[in-house]
Amino acid sequence: YPYATELTRESTRVQQQANLDRAIRRLETDIAGQAVTTVQNATNAESAATVQAQMAAQQQLLSRMQSLKASGRIALELKPERPEYPDLPLEDGDNIIIPTRPGFVSVFGAVLAENAFIHRKDATVDDYLERAGLLREADIDAALIIRADGSVEGNTAHRRWFGGGGFMGKELQPGDAIFVPEKFDRRS
């Protein structure tokens, strides 16, 4: 399945890990600053409980991020119908894997049924999310398609002036995945 070819490189992995570590430090700082402000603004026991729940959710996110390890994968951004490999010089130690064609699309995150669904030609993001079911706290505006070729597409419809974007109508390829994050209350 050439579309899903994986190219991993050690120098890329090192750079990705450095970027991830910086993002974690930034998130730690943001959480600490937000915690102080939010606790100071809590006016009663109910709002204090809400603040505590928000802080627990943010700590969970931080813990998950801290457990991530960079892969070194380079997204080749191939066309599914006619994958052509880019003219990219190889380095010693590069690893290339051409997987077999999967027959599914994965859906995970804030959904009722995290699952791998049978790939259906012409099925869209909306079709797969309907099968998985969205949780009440699903943040569909921040949903992502993680393509089998390693590229990622975000839901940019809410950032476009004329309501375009078409995220929910995008077709998926075998091996693609949809991630739907949870909404976090960003009040301070």
Model-derived regions: residue spans:
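Ser/Thr/Pro/Gly-biased, low-complexity, turn-/loop-rich segments
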Residues: 1-188
